[in-house]
Amino acid sequence: MSEKTNDEKLLYCSFCGKSQREVRKLIAGPSVFICDECIDLCNDIIREEIQVDETAKLSKTSLPTPHEICETLDQYVIGQESAKKILSVAVYNHYKRLRNLSKVNAGSDDIELAKSNILLIGPTGSGKTLLAQTLARLLDVPFVIADATTLTEAGYVGEDVENIIQKLLQASNHDVEKAQRGIVYIDEIDKISRKSDNPSITRDVSGEGVQQALLKLIEGTAALVPPQGGRKHPNQEFIQVDTTNILFICGGAFDGIDKIIRARSEKSGIGFGADVINQNDRKELNKILGDIEPEDLIKYGLIPEFIGRLPVVATLRELNEAALIQILIEPKNALVKQYSKLFSMEGGVELEFREQALVTIARKALARKTGARGLRSILEETLLDIMYDLPSIKNVSKVVIESSSTNDDLQPIIIYAEKPKLARSSK
């Protein structure tokens, strides 16, 4: 009798029929019960269906051609035609491979298409980060920027390399499938170069050690990411993210690498026919960077295995005065357009830059050696006083920025609107 009573009190899963003693958890609903095992099974089914839907969605949406990718880059990045062409082809091939991944895996020819990660080499402010950002926006994929200088080997003070994937997961709203098709841009990659050519007895945790840690991540591995971010702790659950199909773009200025290239070129030059390069000639410097070889990067401090994971190399030229002026006025989100819109919000005030003022701004950026990155700070300094006073000044129609003919100082000139004539009151 007691056994029957116990059986009557025992609860069972409405789906698989297991009793509450056979499962870890039994959740009650309105007149039904479901066990933890059935919940896991349902989650797996939903996850698989979402994955199929995402793949179908990707295959239906048209992938822009290299020409279309390059045209979009032209709207935001001035110059750098060679780098844009290389990037357009590399990114197109990468996402074409992803869209046809199921066909490739099902193929009988056993040809495995490996991904081609990208290395961007160019001076500060030449457009490396902007190129990567524009590509991610065009392709509508998660994008994250990581600073190589903050990375250290696991177990040391600093950021673990897997934190990069954690940030990418956050950028994709914790959608693992979406994150696994994203783009990671690692900036300042030249700063993790090996400190010396000879192996050291002391561990190089922020140089060669980081390169070693990045190898598997860039090539493809199952990265374990804490669900809510933060540092890893024992006994906690992790989200597994496969980095095999994540596109890694690494960028760096590689200051001084031109000397390494020049030294190699001089060794191969024979007699009086060898080219003599003027170090102060910017055009020649750009030409030198275009001749970069893997051995130059090894000499600089990157390990051969790391260079091997970045087969596509694109060099960006140093921007000259004309290019900086173009950057100020031509791109879709040009700085002059941005500040003009900001001023128009102040009661429709028009902002105008005289031609000589643009030349002065470009020359100041060249003097600071910060490339296009320095343009915004120069504009902020120039417009600070007028932006401070403008909300308190009445009846302003236009602000003109012109350059002084004596000392190249930038001066804002305020133009007031004509006061409307008052109608005579009839009494």
Swiss-Prot record:
A GO term for molecular function: unfolded protein binding
Occurrences of domain ClpX-type ZB (ranges): 1-54
SMART domains: AAA, ClpB_D2-small, zf-C4_ClpX
Keywords: ATP-binding, Chaperone, Metal-binding, Nucleotide-binding, Zinc
GO cellular component, one term: HslUV protease complex
Residues the entry annotates as binding Zn(2+): C13, C16, C35, C38
UniProt superkingdom: Bacteria
GO biological process: cell division; proteolysis involved in protein catabolic process
Stored Pfam families: AAA_2 (PF07724), ClpB_D2-small (PF10431), zf-C4_ClpX (PF06689)
Gene3D superfamilies: 1.10.8.60, ClpX chaperone, C4-type zinc finger domain (6.20.220.10), P-loop containing nucleotide triphosphate hydrolases (3.40.50.300)
Binding site for ATP: P123, T124, G125, S126, G127, K128, T129, L130
Function noted in UniProt: ATP-dependent specificity component of the Clp protease. It directs the protease to specific substrates. Can perform chaperone functions in the absence of ClpP.
PANTHER family: ATP-DEPENDENT CLP PROTEASE ATP-BINDING SUBUNIT CLPX-LIKE, MITOCHONDRIAL, ATP-DEPENDENT CLP PROTEASE ATP-BINDING SUBUNIT CLPX-LIKE, MITOCHONDRIAL-RELATED
Subunit-structure text: Component of the ClpX-ClpP complex. Forms a hexameric ring that, in the presence of ATP, binds to fourteen ClpP subunits assembled into a disk-like structure with a central cavity, resembling the structure of eukaryotic proteasomes.
Family: Belongs to the ClpX chaperone family.
Name of the protein: ATP-dependent Clp protease ATP-binding subunit ClpX
Name of the gene this protein is made from: clpX
